[in-house]
């Protein structure tokens, strides 16, 4: 299915012809298809706004979605979108030139949210939370303007797992990024088709394809300390017990509300025991109980 180089989307032209890369590519495609099917992301004839930051994850997402569409396996229109947030030194020509060369429909939007973030966040604090909120609001607006039904993000399995533990350790709740949700206004879906894909696979895929990666440290902000700490914890667990990340991720798909403590998820007040067999027999007539 994926070996004919004469019938391939330009985003995957020049892919390494090694057995290792073929296996990687097929695994990522399979996991993306599984996420799309499991969470019912496809509405035939829909239009998706595929968010492209220039990082390894969003390049992987864009390539795989276009590959699926190219193969007739994703019956939706795709519009790539990059939000240039005015960060100093951002290479503004990289993405539009790349997307044009690949023949990918796209929209490049400039919004100086960087100045807002710098004005609102004290020096020494992480900018990521406010930056993300401003970016999300602009992406929703663009999606509406472009007639899109969904905003598609490049969060992968490790992002989802890290967010779960951040909420557990620091937020006091069991929650993470779901693969599919509806925005607060109720008019747009938000999809994460890379939900089942490991970060390491995204990194290797983008590196092997030699996509022009744009780092996320141009504004001088580093990733939040809490996320870095969680990542280090998970890395340690994975090193001591390979496969631990995948086991924990599967647990997020196997919740049992009756074995947790949230009365909003399970009706503990209405919980009742079933009558014992001996008690049921007391209600029977004597001749049916063998006493006549």
Swiss-Prot record:
Note describing how the cofactor binds: Binds 1 [4Fe-4S] cluster per subunit. The cluster is chelated by three Cys residues, the fourth Fe has a free coordination site that may bind a sulfur atom transferred from the persulfide of IscS.
Keyword presence, Lipoprotein: no
Keyword set includes tRNA-binding: yes
Cited SUPFAM superfamilies: Adenine nucleotide alpha hydrolases-like (SSF52402)
Major place of residence: cytoplasm
InterPro entries: Rossmann-like_a/b/a_fold (IPR014729), TilS/TtcA_N (IPR011063), tRNA_Cyd_32_2_STrfase (IPR012089), tRNA_thiolation_TtcA_Ctu1 (IPR035107)
Compartment list: Cytoplasm
Cofactor(s) essential for the protein: Mg(2+); [4Fe-4S] cluster
GO molecular function: 4 iron, 4 sulfur cluster binding; ATP binding; magnesium ion binding; sulfurtransferase activity; tRNA binding
One Gene Ontology CC term in the entry: cytoplasm
NCBIfam families given in the database record: PRK10696.1
Additional note from the record: The thiolation reaction likely consists of two steps: a first activation step by ATP to form an adenylated intermediate of the target base of tRNA, and a second nucleophilic substitution step of the sulfur (S) atom supplied by the hydrosulfide attached to the Fe-S cluster.
Functional note: Catalyzes the ATP-dependent 2-thiolation of cytidine in position 32 of tRNA, to form 2-thiocytidine (s(2)C32). The sulfur atoms are provided by the cysteine/cysteine desulfurase (IscS) system.
Protein name: tRNA-cytidine(32) 2-sulfurtransferase
Organism: Cereibacter sphaeroides (strain ATCC 17023 / DSM 158 / JCM 6121 / CCUG 31486 / LMG 2827 / NBRC 12203 / NCIMB 8253 / ATH 2.4.1.) (Rhodobacter sphaeroides)
């Amino acid at each position: 299915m994926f070996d004919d180089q004469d019938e391939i989307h330009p985003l995957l032209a020049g892919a390494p012809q090694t057995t290792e890369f073929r296996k990687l590519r097929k695994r990522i495609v399979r996991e993306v298809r599984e996420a799309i099917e499991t969470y019912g992301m496809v509405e035939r004839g829909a239009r998706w706004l595929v968010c492209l930051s220039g990082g390894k994850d969003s390049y992987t997402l864009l390539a795989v979605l276009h590959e699926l569409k190219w193969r007739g396996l994703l019956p939706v229109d795709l519009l790539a979108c990059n939000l240039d947030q005015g960060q100093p030194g951002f290479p503004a020509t990289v993405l539009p030139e790349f997307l044009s060369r690949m023949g990918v429909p796209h929209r490049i939007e400039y919004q100086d949210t960087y100045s807002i973030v710098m004005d609102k966040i004290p020096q020494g604090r992480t900018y990521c939370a406010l930056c993300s909120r401003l970016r999300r609001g602009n992406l929703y607006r663009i999606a509406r303007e472009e007639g899109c039904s969904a905003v598609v993000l490049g969060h992968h399995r490790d992002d989802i797992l890290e967010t779960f533990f951040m909420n557990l350790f620091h937020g006091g709740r069991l929650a993470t990024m779901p693969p599919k949700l509806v925005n607060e206004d109720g008019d747009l879906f938000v999809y994460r088709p890379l939900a089942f894909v490991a970060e390491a696979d995204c990194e290797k895929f983008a590196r092997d394809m030699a996509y022009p990666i744009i780092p996320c440290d141009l504004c001088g902000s580093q990733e939040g300390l809490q996320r870095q700490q969680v990542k280090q914890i998970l890395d340690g667990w994975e090193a001591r017990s390979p496969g631990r990340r995948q086991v924990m991720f599967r647990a997020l798909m196997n919740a049992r509300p009756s074995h947790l403590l949230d009365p909003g998820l399970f009706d503990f007040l209405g919980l009742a025991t079933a009558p014992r067999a001996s008690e049921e027999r007391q209600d029977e007539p004597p001749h049916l109980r063998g006493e006549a």
